[in-house]
Amino acid sequence: MARALLERWEQLAGTASYDAKELAKLCDLSVRQLERDFRRALGRSPQNWLNEERIKAAQELLLSGQPVKVVAFELGFKQVSHFCRQFKFLNNTTASKFVLIQTQEIRNVAHR
């Protein structure tokens, strides 16, 4: 898979809700070919990769002070509850606890 295509999707991943079908269309590939290329190059499906990228973007937005609801909708989740489940699945903690833990760690480092 061309690196440029992956970079393009990385840009899209943090801004809205894209799925494998939309990416395949953007890349002028069939969905099946895109899935094969992704699995070969990255070891996971396009949708799993996209979910991971969206949650990484969510972490940054949450740490910048954005509310969970705003982050969820900004990253294309149609329901806050779906965002919360996805966040917890990938981070083993809730979004609110993630922010609390990260801000405490930052304070601890600052006081050393």
State the predicted function of each range.
Residues 94:
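Nucleic acid-binding interface residues in structured DNA/RNA-binding domains
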Residues 8-10, 32-34, 46, 50-53:
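Catalytic cores of transferase enzymes with a strong primary signal for eukaryotic protein kinases
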Residues 21, 40-78, 100-112:
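Terminal helix-turn-helix DNA-binding modules in bacterial transcription factors
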Residues 2-19, 38, 42, 59-67, ...:
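Basic, amphipathic alpha-helical hairpins
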Residues 21-30, 34, 38, 71-78, ...:
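Append "Primarily bacterial transcriptional regulators
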